[in-house]
């Protein structure tokens, strides 16, 4: 066995020489998918088109073949390199070989693992690992914790020298990280695009380390070197080679821009074109096979790029005289290959899979020896560790993730404390009399409601990290069930802290029963109920593939469970058709248990206004001539048990039954979540182009109009860009860290400058500093354009193509370019000329065929290479004076990379100045650059100057100083390796450069360029911050957003469906409300229920808003395309038509079913107020989102603001008269929901003629000699209500005679108050939208320019 120091990682320490080896055989494999080459993007109307559904039923969807008749065999110890252009089927083949077939409709042919077919191989899922291109990890975990988790789930039973599992994990972690060169990152967070962590190249190596930790005999790698510099990429290929040689691994990989150093490590090569095999055989023969066919491989070119270029007519080089003899199409190449000797020998060299049963037997024994002793004796498991050990590992990791995201935890706990303080002060010191009879159930229902709303954020959270779960499930690290149970376990301590803080504050502030047993009963029930709700919303997320559907269901469930929790409508009052929901609601059981726990054993005194009649002339204490209006009362005493029995049908005996039911629901939701995650399929499949509906594919035309001629002739002003003595410092662990050190350089018009260096040298940092994209740190030195300081218009007049291609997915290519041109070219340029220039750029970048294609997202939209071209186009249509590009060829295949550089060369030859960071360039790509700026570690310069013809100038420089380049080596790779110390004797290249003549010449040239720029008499400074007016920006962004909404049917339809369903549900819940005393309360709750349409809609709206904000902040704000005011203005205005539509639908489905007045003036007023509410909650949600750092933060903040702030103080939960004076005197009047409810409630109550049901009447006797009418005359003169029979002596009294009497208890003293409140609601809508602008302004302040001195 090899030692770790030699760079080989061997985790297989099984005894008796058991090794895991498998031969991978695939014969005549073909793959079919239903996705066509191009599809039409969905719109609001298209998804509702019945013809689509009918077509689907008929099965008329076309099929497409993405792999055809592919065969091969990879034996243990061998490495196969799969090559092909994007779309040729490389990734699809790798998915099939890794036994990941779910994303394909049909896979024909045979795939064998040893002697097993693909069905039998499923039980060895973790022995066939697939590493895809994506580097998605939990960003708040360190590299150490990420690796330890992977290894913890792969600890074999038998370990060398009796080594403990902890020592084993530690040793293997060190070996793997050392082999990949990232051992120094163990304490660094993995991070992502939002959380700072390791670099992109290091994150890629963490992904590679995770697969290596799995130690599977078959390893399938999809573009594993993307984002790595050439030296690291070659080292990784050598690591795979050692793994294959020493541990007999079977390796299959596809790589883009694979240099010759990588290519030479492989044994066999499989070349694909359009899903067909153009070559399969030994690597040594591949180049000569195509050269013999008549193709020429350029000097210094990557052989891998040459093999894939032969099928590209515009790029291949054919030997003179062979033009008519070489094949052109994929079919011709395949036919030629099948007739070759190489094909015959390859097929004859196959070991028959049927004879490889010994491999499967050895694998079965080896896997069995790995299993822990405690593993359950059942059918062979794909997992190394037992379920209990998986749960342990997942639980530890979950706690580590939470520890890394302390902010969310703190927010949860602080929110609970704030909510409890607010709620406790609302229900402060409840009295033991009938005045608290309405408040006490409110105080008990509040924790149920708050934690219901707060748990909704779990649906959002369940979609974060889903790709990680799918990947690690496939790797066999753990069952999703273990992950699910671990989540449930880690909920417990968080909920304990959260609920304890909440309960202690609320319970004692509200002065609920002062009994330890009752407090702890209250506490444990709220904890169980909270856990149950959290798990329920997590289950919703697990069972839904799309977030839109999950948020819709979440919103509906929160409304349903709120209404049927037993608080708004007691069980006996529920309509029979929805009563069953009560039994399925965990919150209903919690509320019953809390009510019984509080009321049983408690006696309340019946006092006025509930003890009737009262006032002067009536008895002041208990009397047979007075009656109590509270159900379950006897005389002037209300027995708690009798009250909850009469009003709610609750019983003391149900407390622990309810607790048991809640725990049962919790377990059920855990099982449901586990089931959803177990059935969750990994996403994948072929990419598909989406076209705008109504568009046609267009071809380039040669005819041009005079306007187009003018547009092409008018190029941007050509400028020279220089920088000198540039230093950049950032704060790091309380000190300053220098990232750039005395860097200088220049870019002239017509010059293409390459910025190169090893990984972590500061290439992107320098580009960000030069382009004014840094918002922190300190910059020193000079950055000049034409010898003058960068002006205010610099960011707008320069183009910057970032590594991440950030675009609005629903826009077409042409729309994205037109948007940029209209907003970034000066306002005085005619619109026709701008559009003509867009056409010119579309032709220049060869985008004509896809100009009407939607940009989309990877997998459903443009390919990576097409997206790069669109990014370039978006910047070019602005006519920039200078163009910056960060890694434009990263992640592309050789031909696509060549295309991008070819386009840049076109631009440069037209006078454009371009500065471009690049790594892993082939010799052909490097040849296209005019100059090179080389950075060594620490941001220090190692070279700046011309490259020369065939890169001879720069190679001579390094040769003179002791590092000559071998004849066949790629110059770019040689230069980068040399400055990293790969020379015979150590050379300090930074010092060599500082002492060189080349540096002095470059500095002299820089001074000359600056002096020439300053002397330009024609220079006119552009002082405009933005190219166009704010009004024009607003109209353009609004138009784009309206199109985006039209093409986002999921978002809009989910909002519409949520409203329609909630309205019908509410309408039939409160069906034809009557005119009894309790029916007045139902009218109030029907309106109160309408308010709860907001949480679901806000939860769905915020990710949409944040997505748009991220695009704005990542690219459009930095390029000064438009102002943040235009962004917020457009966001608010674009939603308005859909909000009015939603209000209309809700009104139509709810108002009439609930039986509200049909008078036009009343119904019209209600409709108007409902529209205002749509505006109100949307603006509040957008205000939270405008400042929130991410979706989860926003989802956690929603219940705090809506629950603590708005619902609590509007006078419904606690009526105005019973509210604490502290809140009543100011916050009640500042709460927009106060006026919202007032505007709605006054109209539907005022004219109601109340007729009490017999059960609602207060009964008492009149004194001897008096009728009820005579006895109550004084009381009725001052107070509301009526007597059923004034002439009787056994009095029956109803508390209200009209709805107006009830309305006055809610501070609606006059009829006009409802219109007054509607006007105030409108003002609150305006102020809420103003808050959105304010929040964005506060956030925008953070992104300031770094100071330059």
Swiss-Prot record:
Protein name: ABC multidrug transporter G
Family: Belongs to the ABC transporter superfamily. ABCG family. PDR (TC 3.A.1.205) subfamily.
Residues where ATP binds: 757-764
Localization, UniProt: Cell membrane
InterPro entries with a match to the protein in the record: AAA+_ATPase, ABC2_TM, ABC_transporter-like_ATP-bd, ABC_transporter-like_CS, ABCG_dom, ABCG_PDR_1, ABCG_PDR_2, P-loop_NTPase
Top-rank taxon: Eukaryota
Pfam family, one: ABC_tran
Family matches, as PANTHER family: ATP-BINDING CASSETTE TRANSPORTER
TM region positions: 407-427, 436-456, 492-512, 523-543, 550-570, 580-600, 659-679, 1056-1076, 1085-1105, 1121-1143, 1166-1186, 1193-1213, 1226-1246, 1318-1338
Gene Ontology terms, MF aspect: ABC-type transporter activity; ATP binding; ATP hydrolysis activity
Keywords: ATP-binding, Cell membrane, Glycoprotein, Hydrolase, Membrane, Nucleotide-binding, Repeat, Transmembrane, Transmembrane helix, Transport
Membrane topology field: Multi-pass membrane protein
GO CC entries: plasma membrane
Glycosylation sites: 144, 549, 649, 994, 1287
SUPFAM superfamilies assigned to the protein according to its UniProt record, in alphabetical order: P-loop containing nucleoside triphosphate hydrolases
């Amino acid at each position: 066995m090899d030692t770790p120091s030699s760079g080989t990682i061997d985790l297989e320490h099984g005894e008796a020489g058991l090794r895991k080896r498998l031969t991978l055989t695939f014969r005549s494999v073909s793959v079919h998918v239903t996705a066509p080459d191009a599809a039409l993007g969905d719109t609001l109307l298209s998804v509702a088109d019945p013809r689509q559904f009918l077509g689907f039923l008929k099965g008329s969807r076309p099929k497409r073949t993405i792999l055809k008749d592919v065969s091969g065999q990879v034996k243990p110890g061998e490495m196969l390199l799969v090559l092909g252009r994007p779309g040729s089927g490389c990734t699809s083949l790798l998915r099939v070989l890794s036994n990941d077939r779910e994303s394909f409709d049909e896979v024909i042919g045979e795939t064998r693992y040893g002697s097993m077919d693909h069905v039998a191989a499923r039980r060895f899922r973790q022995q066939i690992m697939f590493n895809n291109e994506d580097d998605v990890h939990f960003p708040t975990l360190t590299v150490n914790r990420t690796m330890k988790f992977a290894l913890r789930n792969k600890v074999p039973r038998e370990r060398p020298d009796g080594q403990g599992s902890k020592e084993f994990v530690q040793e293997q972690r060190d070996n793997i990280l050392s082999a990949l060169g990232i051992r120094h990152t163990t304490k660094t967070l993995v991070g992502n695009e939002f959380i700072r962590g390791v670099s992109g190249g290091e994150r890629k190596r963490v992904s590679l380390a995770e697969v290596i930790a799995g130690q599977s005999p078959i390893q399938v790698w999809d573009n594993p070197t993307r984002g790595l510099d050439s030296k690291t990429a070659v080292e990784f290929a050598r690591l795979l080679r050692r793994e294959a040689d020493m541990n007999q691994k079977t390796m299959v990989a596809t790589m883009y821009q694979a240099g010759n150093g990588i290519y030479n490590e492989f044994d066999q090569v499989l070349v694909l074109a359009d899903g067909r095999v153009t070559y399969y055989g030994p690597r040594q023969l591949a180049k000569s096979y195509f050269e013999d066919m008549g193709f020429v491989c350029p000097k210094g070119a990557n052989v891998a790029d040459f093999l894939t270029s032969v099928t590209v007519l515009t790029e291949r080089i054919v030997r003179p005289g062979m033009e008519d003899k070489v094949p052109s199409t994929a079919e011709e190449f395949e036919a030629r290959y099948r007739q070759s000797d190489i094909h015959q020998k390859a097929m004859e060299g196959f070991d028959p899979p049927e004879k490889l049963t010994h491999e499967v037997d050895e694998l079965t024994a080896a896997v069995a020896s790995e299993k822990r002793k405690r593993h359950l004796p059942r059918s062979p498991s794909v997992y190394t560790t037992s379920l209990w050990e998986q749960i342990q590992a997942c639980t530890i990791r979950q706690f580590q993730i939470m520890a890394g995201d302390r902010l969310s935890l703190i927010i949860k706990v602080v929110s609970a404390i704030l909510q409890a303080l607010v709620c406790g002060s609302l229900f402060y010191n409840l009295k033991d009399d009938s005045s608290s009879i309405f408040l006490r159930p409110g105080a008990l229902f509040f924790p149920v409601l708050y934690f219901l709303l707060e748990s909704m954020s779990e649906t959002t959270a369940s979609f974060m990290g889903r790709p990680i779960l799918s990947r690690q499930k496939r790797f066999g690290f753990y069952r999703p069930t273990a992950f699910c149970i671990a989540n449930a376990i880690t909920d417990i301590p968080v909920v304990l802290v959260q609920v304890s803080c909440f309960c202690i504050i609320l319970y004692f502030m509200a002065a609920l029963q002062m009994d330890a047993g009752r407090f702890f009963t209250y506490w444990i029930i709220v904890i169980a109920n909270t856990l149950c709700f959290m798990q329920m919303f997590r289950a919703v997320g697990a069972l839904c593939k799309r977030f839109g559907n999950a948020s819709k269901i979440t919103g509906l469930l929160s409304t349903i469970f709120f209404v049927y929790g037993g608080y708004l409508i007691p069980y006996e009052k529920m309509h029979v058709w929805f009563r069953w929901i009560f039994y399925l609601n965990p919150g209903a059981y919690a509320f019953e248990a809390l009510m019984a726990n509080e009321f049983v054993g408690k006696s309340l005194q019946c006092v006025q206004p509930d003890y009737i009649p009262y006032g002067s002339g009536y008895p002041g204490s208990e009397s047979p001539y007075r009656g109590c209006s509270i159900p379950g009362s006897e005389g002037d005493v209300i027995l708690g048990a009798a009250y909850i029995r009469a009003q709610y049908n609750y019983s003391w005996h149900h407390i622990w039954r309810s607790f048991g039911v809640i725990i049962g629901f919790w377990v059920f939701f855990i099982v449901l979540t586990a089931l959803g995650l177990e059935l969750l399929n990994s996403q994948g499949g072929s990419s598909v182009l989406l076209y705008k509906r109504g568009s046609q594919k267009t071809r380039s035309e040669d005819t041009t109009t005079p306007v187009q001629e003018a547009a092409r002739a008018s190029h941007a002003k050509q400028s020279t860009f220089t920088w000198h003595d540039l230093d950049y410092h950032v704060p790091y662990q309380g000190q300053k860290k220098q990232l750039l050190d005395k860097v200088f350089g220049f870019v002239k018009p017509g010059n293409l400058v390459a910025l190169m260096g090893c990984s972590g040298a500061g290439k992107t940092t320098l580009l960000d500093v030069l382009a004014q994209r840094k918002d922190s740190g300190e910059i020193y030195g000079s950055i000049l354009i034409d010898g003058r300081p960068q002006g205010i218009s610099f960011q707008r007049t320069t183009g910057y193509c970032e590594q991440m291609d950030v675009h609005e997915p629903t826009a077409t290519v042409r729309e994205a370019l037109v948007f940029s041109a209209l907003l970034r070219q000066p306002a005085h340029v005619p619109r026709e000329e701008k559009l003509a220039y867009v056409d010119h750029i579309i032709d220049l970048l060869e985008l004509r065929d896809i100009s009407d294609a939607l940009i989309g997202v990877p997998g459903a939209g443009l390919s990576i290479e097409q997206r790069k071209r669109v990014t370039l186009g978006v910047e070019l249509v602005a006519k920039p004076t200078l163009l910056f590009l960060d890694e434009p060829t990263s992640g592309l295949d050789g031909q696509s990379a060549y295309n991008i550089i070819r386009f840049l060369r076109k631009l440069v030859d037209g006078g454009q100045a371009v500065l471009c960071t690049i790594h892993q360039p082939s010799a052909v790509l490097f040849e296209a650059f005019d100059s090179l700026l080389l950075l060594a570690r620490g941001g220090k310069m190692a070279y700046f100057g011309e490259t020369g013809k065939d890169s001879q100038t720069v190679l001579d420089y390094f040769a003179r100083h002791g590092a000559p380049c071998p004849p066949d080596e790629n110059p770019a790779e040689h230069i980068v390796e040399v400055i990293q110390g790969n020379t015979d004797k150590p050379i300090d290249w930074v010092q060599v450069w500082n002492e060189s003549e080349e540096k002095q010449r470059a500095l002299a040239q820089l001074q000359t360029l600056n002096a020439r720029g300053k002397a330009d008499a024609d220079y006119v400074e552009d002082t405009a911050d933005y190219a166009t007016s704010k009004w024009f920006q607003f109209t353009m962004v609004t138009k784009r957003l309206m199109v985006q909404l039209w093409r986002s049917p999921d978002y809009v339809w989910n909002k519409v469906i949520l409203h329609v369903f909630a309205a019908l549900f509410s309408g039939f819940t409160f069906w034809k409300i009557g005119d009894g005393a309790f029916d007045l309360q139902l009218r109030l709750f029907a309106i109160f229920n309408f308010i709860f349409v907001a949480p679901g809609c806000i939860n769905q709206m915020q990710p949409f808003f944040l997505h748009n904000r991220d695009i704005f902040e990542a690219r459009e704000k930095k390029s000064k395309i438009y102002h943040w005011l235009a962004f917020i203005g457009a966001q608010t205005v674009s939603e308005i038509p859909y909000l009015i539509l939603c209000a209309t639908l809700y009104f139509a489905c709810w108002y009439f079913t609930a039986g509200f007045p049909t008078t036009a003036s009343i119904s019209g007023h209600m409709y108007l107020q409902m529209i205002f509410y749509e505006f109100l909650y949307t603006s509040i949600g957008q205000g939270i989102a405008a400042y929130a750092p991410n979706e989860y933060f926003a989802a956690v903040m929603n219940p705090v603001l809506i629950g603590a702030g708005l619902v609590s103080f509007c006078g419904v939960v606690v009526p105005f008269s019973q509210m604490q004076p502290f809140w009543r005197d100011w916050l009640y009047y500042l709460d927009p929901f106060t006026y919202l409810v007032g505007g709605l409630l006054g109209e539907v109550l005022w004219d109601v003629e109340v007729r009490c049901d017999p059960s609602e009447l207060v009964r008492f006797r009149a004194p001897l000699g008096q009728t009820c009418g005579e006895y109550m005359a004084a009381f009725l003169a001052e107070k509301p209500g009526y007597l059923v029979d004034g002439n009787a002596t056994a009095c029956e009294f109803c508390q209200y005679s009209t709805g107006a009497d009830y309305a006055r208890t809610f501070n609606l003293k006059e009829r006009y108050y409802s219109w007054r409140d509607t006007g105030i609601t409108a003002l609150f809508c305006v102020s809420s939208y103003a808050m959105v602008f304010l929040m964005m302004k506060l956030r925008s302040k953070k992104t300031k320019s770094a100071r330059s001195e």
